[in-house]
UniProtKB/Swiss-Prot annotation:
The UniProt record lists the keyword Membrane: yes
Cellular component GO terms, alphabetical: plasma membrane
Documented effect of changing residue 249 to A: 2.1-fold decrease in vxrA expression and 11.7-fold reduction in survival following penicillin G treatment
Keywords: Cell inner membrane, Cell membrane, Disulfide bond, Kinase, Membrane, Phosphoprotein, Transferase, Transmembrane, Transmembrane helix, Two-component regulatory system
Induction remark: The Vxr system positively regulates its expression.
Membrane topology note: Multi-pass membrane protein
Cytoplasmic side: 1-12, 281-499
Function: Member of the two-component regulatory system VxrB/VxrA involved in the regulation of diverses processes, including virulence, the type VI secretion system (T6SS) and biofilm formation. Functions as a sensor protein kinase which is autophosphorylated at a histidine residue and transfers its phosphate group to the conserved aspartic acid residue in the regulatory domain of VxrB. Is critical for colonization in the infant mouse model. Contributes to the resistance to beta-lactam treatment.
Protein's UniProt name: Sensor histidine kinase VxrA
The keyword Disulfide bond is annotated on this UniProt entry: yes
Alphabetized InterPro entries for the sequence: 2C_sensor_his_kinase (IPR050980), HATPase_C_sf (IPR036890), His_kinase_dom (IPR005467), HisK_dim/P_dom (IPR003661), HisK_dim/P_sf (IPR036097), VxrA-like (IPR049705), VxrA_SD (IPR021821)
Phylogenetic classification of the source organism: Bacteria, Pseudomonadati, Pseudomonadota, Gammaproteobacteria, Vibrionales
Side Periplasmic, residues: 32-257
Record localization: Cell inner membrane
Length: 499
C-alpha cells in the first residue's frame, strides 16, 4: 500500500512531467530498503546484530546489579506504604506505637520484624548492620528500615547505605551505575529487574548479551534502527505496542508523513506550474491574436484603396447615367449598393480593429423607427412585423447593430416559426430589441446555442458573433421563451426632444 503514494497522474506538459518523475524517484527512495528483513521480529534481530559491543559506552554485569541492588531497593513501589503485605489494623497500631512508644501492641506474626525495629527505636537500643541484612529491608510505612534508622542515628548512615533504596541515597556521580539507576523510570526499572533483552533509559539503550548489559548512546541507537528499517517509542498508556522489548515498542519505520509532505509539495508545484503554463499560453495566444489583428488592420487599410477606386469608377458611371442602356439600370443599381456596402464594411472593420476592447464608435440616428422600417421593408419583404413603443433619436453604431439585428431576423425567418416580430422598446439611455418567432427555445438552450459551430439549426457561429458585437457596444444579449425571443439591450444616448 505504500507504493500507492507515488502513483501520479500522467500529463503532457514536459516541465510538470519532469517534476513528477523527480518526485516519484524521491518517493521510492524514501520507501524501506528492499534488503531489510520482511517481518518485524527479523528486523529487530537485524537491529541487534548491527551493534559493535566493543564500542559500548559502558557495561554492567547483571549478577553484580542483583547482588548490590536487590529488587526491593530498586522498585518505586518500595517507597509506598506496604498495605498489601501487612494487616491494615496492625499497621495502624504500629504507627501509634512509633509516635508515642506506648499503647497496644500488634499481635500478627507478620508484624514481628517491624515491631522489633519500632521498639528498638523507642528504647534507644542499637541494631547491627547484620540485622538490616537479614531483614526484609522495607518498612511497612514505605522506604527502608536503614534510612529510618539513619535518620535517628546519622553516624550510622554510611554503614547502612547498602541497605537503603536507591532513591534514599545521595545523588551519585554521573556515569556510575547508581547514577543510571537513580535516573531510570519505572518501566525501565521493571525491565531491568525482569532481565529484559533491551530497554531504554534517557538517551541510552541497555542491550543485554548473556549476563552483561551494554550501554549505547542515542546516535548509535538511531543509526542502527534506521538501517534495520525500524521505528520505536517508549512504552506508555497512550501507545499501541505491536512488539515490545523491555520498555520499547517497535514498529516498521513509517514514511507516511514524509510521503504525505512530498505529495503536498508535488500538488502545490503542479498547481503553480499549471498556472504558469496557462499564463504562458494565454500570453502566447494574446500575442498571436495581436499579430493577426495587425495583419487584418493592414489588409483593411489596403482594401480602402481599391474600394476608393471602385467608388470613383461608380461615380464616373453615375455622371454618364443618362447614356447607359436601360437594360443596365438594375445592374448599375446593384453596383452602387455593393460599392456603398463595401465602403461601410471597410470603415466598420477599421473602427472595430482600432478600438480593441473599447466600445465601438457610434453616430446619431435621427429616427430609430425610420431606420428599422427601411431595413424590415427592403430586406425582409414583409416577413417581419415591426413594433415600436416610441420613436426617438439614438446614438448607435449603425453598421454593427444593423448587422446583429439582421442576423437575428434572418435566423428567425429561416429557422424559426412564423410570424416573426421585431419589437423595439426605447427608454432613456437604453434601446431594447426583441426578435420573436413562435419557436420553442428557452433560456436553458442559451448556453448550448452560444457555442461556436453548434449544429442546432446552424445558429451557433452567428449568435456567437452577435453576442460579441453586442458586448463591444456595451450591451448584453439574452434568450427567453417560449416563444423564442432573442433580446438585445443596447445602452446609448437618446433624445426624444428632436422627435
Amino acid at each position: 500500500m505504500r507504493y500507492s503514494f507515488c502513483m501520479l497522474e500522467k500529463t503532457n506538459i514536459p516541465l510538470i512531467r519532469a517534476l513528477n518523475l523527480t518526485l516519484v524517484s524521491l518517493c521510492f527512495a524514501m520507501l524501506p530498503n528492499p534488503v531489510h528483513a520482511d517481518s518485524l521480529p527479523e528486523r529487530i534481530d537485524l537491529f541487534v546484530s548491527l551493534f559493535d559491543y566493543n564500542s559500548a559506552t559502558t557495561s554492567y554485569d547483571i549478577r553484580s546489579i542483583q547482588t548490590d541492588f536487590p529488587t526491593r531497593l530498586l522498585t518505586p513501589d518500595s517507597m509506598l506504604p506496604q498495605t498489601s503485605e501487612y494487616p491494615l489494623k496492625d499497621i495502624q497500631l504500629l504507627y501509634k506505637l512509633a509516635q508515642s512508644c506506648t499503647g497496644k501492641l500488634p499481635l500478627s506474626p507478620l508484624i514481628t520484624e517491624p515491631l522489633v525495629f519500632t521498639r528498638s527505636l523507642c528504647k534507644g537500643s542499637s541494631l547491627s548492620p547484620r540485622w538490616f541484612a537479614r531483614s526484609g529491608l522495607i518498612h511497612p510505612g514505605g522506604g527502608t528500615y536503614a534510612f529510618r534508622y539513619a535518620e535517628k542515628y546519622p553516624a550510622q548512615f554510611a554503614n547502612l547505605l547498602p541497605y537503603m533504596h536507591i532513591q534514599e541515597r545521595p545523588n551519585a556521580a554521573e556515569g556510575t551505575l547508581l547514577y543510571h539507576l537513580q535516573n531510570m523510570g519505572e518501566d525501565a526499572i521493571n525491565a531491568l529487574v525482569s532481565g529484559a533483552s533491551m530497554f531504554g533509559s534517557g538517551s541510552d539503550l541497555w542491550l543485554r548479551k548473556g549476563d552483561i548489559y551494554y550501554l549505547f548512546n542515542e546516535e548509535t541507537w538511531l543509526t542502527n534502527a534506521n538501517k534495520a528499517g525500524l521505528s520505536y517509542s517508549l512504552l506508555s498508556a497512550d501507545n499501541t505496542c505491536f512488539i515490545q522489548r523491555g520498555n520499547i515498542c517497535w514498529d516498521v519505520e513509517d514514511h507516511s508523513d514524509l510521503l504525505r509532505t512530498s505529495m503536498i509539495i508535488l500538488v502545490i508545484a503542479n498547481i503553480f506550474l499549471v498556472l504558469g503554463w496557462s499564463g504562458y499560453r494565454w500570453n502566447s495566444k494574446r500575442q498571436e491574436m495581436r499579430s493577426r489583428m495587425l495583419i487584418l488592420q493592414i489588409l483593411t487599410h489596403e482594401l480602402r484603396t481599391p474600394i476608393a477606386s471602385l467608388s470613383l469608377t461608380v461615380e464616373g458611371f453615375r455622371r454618364e447615367f443618362e447614356h447607359l442602356p436601360e437594360s443596365l439600370y438594375d445592374e448599375f443599381r446593384r453596383l452602387c449598393e455593393d460599392s456603398r456596402r463595401l465602403r461601410q464594411l471597410a470603415e466598420a472593420s477599421k473602427d472595430y480593429l482600432q478600438s480593441d476592447s473599447k466600445p465601438l464608435a457610434s453616430d446619431w440616428v435621427p429616427s430609430v423607427e425610420e431606420w428599422l422600417q427601411y431595413k424590415v421593408e427592403e430586406e425582409f419583404s414583409g416577413n417581419v412585423t415591426l413594433k415600436l413603443n416610441q420613436d426617438i433619436a439614438a446614438k448607435l453604431n449603425v453598421y454593427w447593430l444593423g448587422t446583429c439585428v439582421d442576423n437575428l431576423l434572418r435566423n428567425a425567418v429561416k429557422y424559426g416559426v412564423a410570424p416573426v416580430t421585431l419589437e423595439v422598446i426605447t427608454q432613456t439611455n437604453l434601446v431594447t430589441f426583441k426578435v420573436t418567432d413562435q419557436g420553442s427555445l428557452t433560456h436553458r438552450d442559451w448556453r448550448h446555442l452560444r457555442k461556436p459551430f453548434v449544429s442546432k439549426s446552424g445558429l451557433g457561429l452567428g449568435l456567437t458573433i452577435v453576442e460579441s458585437m453586442v458586448g463591444r457596444m456595451g450591451g448584453k444579449m439574452s434568450l427567453e421563451g417560449p416563444p423564442t425571443t432573442f433580446i438585445l439591450e443596447i445602452p446609448c444616448e437618446t433624445d426624444t426632444a428632436s422627435r
